[in-house]
Amino acid sequence: TRVRSSAASDVYKRQIITCPCFVGMYFLAEKIAALIYNAPGAADAIQTMSVGILLLGLHQISTGILQGLGRTSIPVINMILAAAVKVFLSWTLTAIPTLGIKGAAMATVVDFGLAAVLNMIFIYKYTGFALSFSGVFKPAVSAAAMGAAVYGVITLAVSWGAWAILAAIAVAVPVYGGVLLAVGGMGKDDLESLPFIGHRLLAAGQKLGYFR
């Protein structure tokens, strides 16, 4: 149906953005912790929170889909339930000495994930749409290639400090975009829907002969 197709398209476009953000934050966690917080030991918590990027993205887009279907109360209820679980887990996990602040990060990830899963259950109920492996394969492969490139950069530039982050980002963006285009993970419609840079990327692709 049209609603199911629209939901699938919206979720896919969100994954195009969240997959590389998750991978980038995971591999750059130690650098970010040292630069922003002056606390390299917080890297584990940041890596844990990086998973939340994927789940938060899914939660946000699934909330929008349910609101578009006129089921505005459902995501609110799901968010309240997930928040209650987060409070319990935060209280429990942070009390474990071996976890500490990482326990709070884990509780937040569960919060995002539970709210997203509950939303997706209702989306399936009303539209028949469900997440599939094929729907995340291309962004995941592209993000994995990007992750390998980022890891290589931060390994070689280990003594560069903050510049290592900038170097990694400078390499990550073209690698992710190039692989995503190479595997057919982004079409003209996908590019046009991206805010701010979509039309510019499409114009560049047309000049290079990738898009007609």
List each model region and its residues.
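Hydrophobic alpha-helical transmembrane bundles that constitute the permease/transmembrane domains
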Residues: 10-13, 19, 54-61, 80-88, ...
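Membrane-interface helix-loop junctions in multi-pass transport and translocation proteins
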Residues: 70-76, 83-121, 148, 152-173, ...
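Single conserved hydrophobic/aromatic residue that forms the stacking wall/gate
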Residues: 1-8, 12
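Membrane-interface junctions at transmembrane-helix termini in multi-pass inner-membrane proteins
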Residues: 47, 51-81, 91-92
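Alpha-helical transmembrane segments
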Residues: 62-70, 120-135, 186-189
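Short helix-capping/hinge motifs at transmembrane helix termini and TM-loop junctions
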Residues: 28-33, 37-39, 94-98, 127, ...
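Interfacial segments at transmembrane-helix termini and the short loops linking adjacent helices
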Residues: 25-54
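Membrane-proximal transmembrane or re-entrant/amphipathic helices at the cytosolic face
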Residues: 151-212
